[in-house]
């Protein structure tokens, strides 16, 4: 979660970075890259519509330098001008939540089907509401020899804080509960969360919100980044486990800016190897592939935790579109290969259709 958007993201502490990528398709060869560049007319034009903070965190010098070597040209889109008068573009990257802009982009997609828009605005909408955000994970009901993937039981509260205790009791949710804003709109406030230990504190919350049952997970969270058909996992510190003492001696609401920087003592903590162990690759590959297909997205990450004491039970607790890739080790090469693969796939389809 965020306090000051990108500024607070820099304060996230990594426990350990997973050293290996999990590709779902082979990387581009030198010959394939050359073919892609040729198809793109000697250069690949990527238009971007991002906030200033997103531009700073994503379009870092190393990425731009590598892009130039691969004949990829990033062009800023002017939102004050008609999109059809700009370009031409091969790919459009965007992360703006303005509804008018979303409609402009949808209209542009219809008029220019040859341009790849990352990602379709209508697909992104599912991640702007926490009531629908995790539904695809729940519907997937993923369980195999490598583990089980669940979502926390949750309850949506639209209004009237005083009604929350009775609503929680009726739904049968177990304390403690994590409260998150219902709408994710890119602001720091929409990424804040609160932890409520007792029933009497629930009426102190501010709807509309989603209440999720807190699952003890050893204070470790796995951030799983998805870029097309490649995934990478990074460990982060998270909220500490809750015990009986906490439940009996905390009667208020504890507020945190984001899950992965919620504890001040994490930096010096010793991590149990059984807690820090990454989820099995086959499980992550299956989950990443299914979410990409069901969500209709190619740029996202999801936060996953392992239930403490249950080696094979995992929970997805959040999904984010176009996350902070700048904090993902080696993101520059991964992203450039992804952009080139998009044009390569277009080239293959063009050949098969001719």
Curated annotation (Swiss-Prot):
Residues at which Mg(2+) 2 binds: 318, 320
Residue numbers binding Mg(2+) 1: 303, 318
Pfam families assigned to the protein according to its UniProt record, in alphabetical order: Ins134_P3_kin (PF05770), Ins134_P3_kin_N (PF17927)
UniProt remark on cofactor binding: Binds 2 magnesium ions per subunit.
InterPro entries: Inositol_tetrakis-P_1-kinase, InsP(3)kin_ATP-grasp, ITPK1_N
Catalytic activity: 1D-myo-inositol 3,4,5,6-tetrakisphosphate + ATP = 1D-myo-inositol 1,3,4,5,6-pentakisphosphate + ADP + H(+); 1D-myo-inositol 1,3,4-trisphosphate + ATP = 1D-myo-inositol 1,3,4,5-tetrakisphosphate + ADP + H(+); 1D-myo-inositol 1,3,4-trisphosphate + ATP = 1D-myo-inositol 1,3,4,6-tetrakisphosphate + ADP + H(+)
Tissue expression pattern: Expressed in roots, leaves, flowers, anthers and embryos.
Similarity comment: Belongs to the ITPK1 family.
Subunit structure comment from the entry: Monomer.
Annotated organism of origin: Oryza sativa subsp. japonica (Rice)
Annotated binding of 1D-myo-inositol 1,3,4-trisphosphate, by residue: 53, 95, 191, 223, 320
Gene that produces this protein: ITPK1
Cofactor needs: Mg(2+)
Enzyme class, spelled out: transferase
Gene Ontology biological process: inositol trisphosphate metabolic process
Protein name: Inositol-tetrakisphosphate 1-kinase 1
């Amino acid at each position: 979660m965020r306090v000051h958007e990108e500024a607070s993201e820099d304060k996230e502490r990594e426990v350990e970075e997973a050293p290996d990528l999990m590709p779902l398709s082979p990387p581009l060869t030198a010959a394939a890259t050359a073919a892609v560049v040729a198809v793109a007319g000697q250069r690949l034009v990527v238009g971007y519509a991002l906030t200033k903070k997103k531009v700073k965190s994503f379009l870092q010098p190393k990425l731009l330098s590598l892009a130039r070597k691969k004949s990829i040209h990033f062009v800023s889109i002017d939102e004050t001008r008609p999109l059809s008068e700009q370009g031409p573009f091969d790919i459009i990257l965007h992360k703006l939540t303005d509804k008018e802009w979303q409609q402009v982009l949808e209209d542009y997609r219809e008029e220019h089907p040859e341009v790849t828009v990352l990602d379709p605005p209508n697909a992104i909408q599912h991640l702007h509401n926490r009531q629908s955000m995790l539904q695809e994970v729940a519907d997937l009901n993923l369980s195999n020899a490598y583990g089980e993937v669940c979502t926390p039981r949750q309850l949506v509260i639209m209004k009237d804080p005083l009604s929350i205790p009775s609503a929680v009791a009726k739904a049968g949710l177990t304390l403690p509960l994590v409260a998150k804003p219902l709408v994710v709109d890119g602001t720091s406030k929409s990424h804040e969360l609160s932890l409520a230990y007792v029933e009497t504190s629930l009426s102190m919350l501010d709807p509309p919100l989603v209440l999720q049952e807190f699952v003890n997970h050893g204070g470790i969270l796995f951030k799983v980044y998805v870029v097309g058909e490649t995934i990478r996992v990074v460990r982060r510190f998270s909220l500490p486990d809750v015990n009986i003492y906490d439940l009996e001696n905390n009667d208020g609401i504890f507020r945190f800016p984001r899950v992965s920087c919620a504890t001040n003592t994490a930096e010096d903590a010793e991590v149990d190897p059984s807690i820090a162990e990454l989820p099995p690759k086959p499980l992550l590959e299956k989950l990443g592939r299914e979410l990409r297909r069901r969500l209709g997205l190619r740029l996202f990450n999801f936060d996953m935790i392992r239930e403490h004491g249950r080696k094979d039970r995992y929970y997805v607790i959040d999904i984010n579109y176009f996350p902070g890739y700048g904090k993902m080790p080696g993101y520059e090469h991964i992203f450039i290969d992804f952009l080139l693969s998009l044009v390569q796939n277009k080239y293959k389809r063009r050949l098969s259709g001719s």
